[in-house]
């Protein structure tokens, strides 16, 4: 990293130049600690939980996807549904995205979720920000994306890494910003990488609980 400037994720618009700077490790991605921002994220998660209590049927949470939207998932199987979704879409092909491309994917997803309208937890945003900060980069194939949004396949690899599955190239030592070194990376399990990060960021919950909310 050539300088120590930070780009804050707080729900405000992000310029493409900001994403490029994070991708090149010319800037840090900093998730806002502002109480009002975090309260807004929590309200989104609480809204989803309230819908589940009052209605019990929410597309993609307690139902199947696409043409299976009329299939209601039994309550005892709902926690397993996200795992099946990212496993189903984890069939990408071709070369792996390079580190800069992968950082851009993570930054774009963090920016999207930081709007507070996705019903995710603050802990999930913290985990994504920690992946960028510590350069924990899921291995994402460049080909095979499907769906209207065009990002289901690549994001399935991000979700798997957040849940401690698949392998990631990971720094053996904590990154030293301002210096570029080679030979520090090896492939480790996502669970091992997340376990190494936790002492540096005590706010993280387990990858499973963070990704499930």
Predicted feature residues:
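Conserved, well-structured ligand/cofactor-binding cores
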Residues: 1-213
């Amino acid at each position: 990293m050539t300088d120590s400037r930070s780009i804050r994720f707080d729900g405000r618009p992000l310029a493409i130049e900001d994403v490029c700077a994070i991708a090149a490790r010319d800037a840090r991605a900093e998730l806002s600690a502002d109480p009002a921002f975090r309260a807004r994220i929590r309200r989104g998660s609480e809204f989803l939980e309230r819908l589940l209590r009052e209605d019990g049927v929410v597309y993609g949470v307690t139902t199947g996807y696409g043409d299976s939207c009329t299939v209601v998932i039994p309550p005892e199987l709902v926690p397993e549904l996200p795992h099946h979704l990212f496993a189903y879409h984890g069939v990408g092909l071709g070369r792996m995205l390079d580190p800069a491309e992968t950082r851009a994917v993570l930054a774009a997803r963090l920016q999207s979720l930081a709007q507070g309208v996705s019903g995710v937890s603050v802990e999930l945003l913290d985990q994504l920000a920690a992946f960028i900060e510590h350069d924990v980069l899921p291995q994402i194939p460049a080909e095979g994306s499907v769906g209207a949004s065009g990002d289901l396949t690549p994001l399935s690899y991000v979700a798997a890494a957040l849940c401690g599955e698949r392998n990631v190239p990971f720094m053996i030592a904590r990154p030293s910003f301002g210096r570029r070194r080679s030979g520090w990376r090896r492939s480790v399990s996502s669970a091992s990488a997340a376990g190494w990060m936790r002492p540096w960021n005590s706010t993280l919950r387990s990858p499973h609980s963070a990704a499930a909310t």
